[in-house]
């Protein structure tokens, strides 16, 4: 066993979605604990604040994004970073059976605040180590959680592993606008206006911090081209990005192979 010097900085993951945001945490271990606590603390108010942020249009957008990603009735779905279930709720509608949809998230508080159907399965877990067998799902979604994982390569390899051959991937994320004016506008909206509005929703101070953190992680996130390259490196095919109104990125991909050709294997522990 190698003894690590206590003063040695913790290495940054090889394909981290962004540099450490030291205004909030110092190390990768700190980041995971910080995010879990912040999401747990803000779970009760999350949906109401999100509805304000999106002006009530979020459900319709998520519904259409999943359709563009290829989600159809009868598909077996995994929603990674399920949170309070905003994306999973639309997946339940589109599949026609909530029992076909599984959600996984590292924040038990967020999942406890969800209003999802009782027949949908919710499990605690992380994108980098999914507790499911190989070749298990027809469709994998993730809504606005790409910035919160530790290593894109590790997580994307897990996504590819649990998808069946021919299975589809749809990752939704907010991307920093290229236009300087729109970037300034979105920054001030998320770092200033939304944190101010949270005071009318809740006395929980972490709500304001959460939305400022969201913008800072968006601003620091790796460019879409790097996300696409990392997805392709896992062996996923038909990798592409669809962009809505200049900020909503939809990363889509398909697992190689013909549907029905995969063999379900033992899950990782």
Name each model-derived stretch.
Residues 167-174:
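Conserved beta-strand signature within the Rossmann-like core of class I S-adenosyl-L-methionine
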């Amino acid at each position: 066993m190698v003894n690590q010097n206590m003063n040695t900085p913790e290495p940054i993951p090889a394909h981290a979605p962004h540099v450490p945001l030291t205004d909030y945490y110092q190390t990768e271990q700190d980041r995971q604990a910080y995010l879990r606590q912040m999401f747990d603390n803000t779970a009760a108010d999350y949906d109401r604040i999100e509805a304000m942020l999106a002006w009530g249009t979020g459900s319709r957008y998520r519904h259409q994004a999943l359709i563009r990603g290829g989600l159809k009735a009868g598909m077996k779905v995994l929603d990674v970073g399920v949170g309070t279930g905003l994306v999973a709720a639309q997946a339940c509608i589109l599949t026609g059976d909530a029992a076909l949809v599984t959600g996984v998230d590292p924040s038990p508080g967020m999942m406890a605040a969800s209003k999802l159907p009782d027949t949908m399965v919710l499990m605690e877990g992380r994108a980098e180590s999914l507790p499911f067998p190989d070749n298990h799902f027809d469709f994998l979604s993730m809504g606005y959680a790409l910035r919160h994982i530790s290593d894109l390569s590790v997580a994307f390899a897990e996504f590819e592993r649990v998808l069946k051959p021919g299975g589809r991937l749809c990752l939704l994320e907010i991307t920093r606008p290229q236009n300087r004016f729109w970037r300034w506008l979105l920054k001030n909206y998320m770092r200033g206006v939304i944190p101010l509005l949270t005071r009318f929703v809740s006395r929980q101070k972490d709500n304001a911090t959460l939305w400022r953190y969201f913008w800072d992680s968006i601003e620091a996130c790796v460019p879409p081209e790097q996300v696409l390259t990392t997805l392709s490196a896992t062996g996923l095919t038909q990798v592409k990005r669809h962009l809505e109104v200049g900020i909503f990125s939809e990363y889509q991909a398909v697992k190689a192979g013909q549907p029905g050709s995969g063999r379900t294997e033992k899950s990782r522990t």
